[in-house]
């Protein structure tokens, strides 16, 4: 039982170290892509829907929203949540490396529980 716990704990440490370096690379790539997208957006004309001094901006994660298209990021969706009996819609990141790492940790914890039995 102790051996099983030690093996899984060492796996978690390896995944945490690997994911942090992968996340740093991913953030750097996203930041670079954002710069390129911003420059290319400046070259195009504004949409017909945007009038006057109004400009479109995206809603950050965990802020209220109405539609998926309002949220920032490719894997971010406008998802409904229930808070104190009221339904609210929040922008949430539903994909990416973090979700995969958390899923791996959840599977590892379930393996530890099965080792104890």
Curated annotation (Swiss-Prot):
Chain segments carrying region Disordered: 20-55
Record keywords: Disulfide bond, Ion channel impairing toxin, Knottin, Secreted, Signal, Toxin
One Gene Ontology MF term: toxin activity
Tissue and organ distribution: Expressed by the venom gland.
Recorded GO CC terms: extracellular region
Residue pairs linked by disulfide bridges in the UniProt entry: 58-72, 65-78, 69-115, 71-91
Compositionally biased tracts (Basic and acidic residues): 23-55
Propeptide section residues: 21-56
Signal peptide: 1-20
Subcellular localization: Secreted
Function: Putative ion channel inhibitor.
Domain notes: The presence of a 'disulfide through disulfide knot' structurally defines this protein as a knottin.
Family of this protein: Belongs to the neurotoxin 03 (Tx2) family. 02 subfamily. HNTX-XV sub-subfamily.
Protein name: Hainantoxin-XV-2
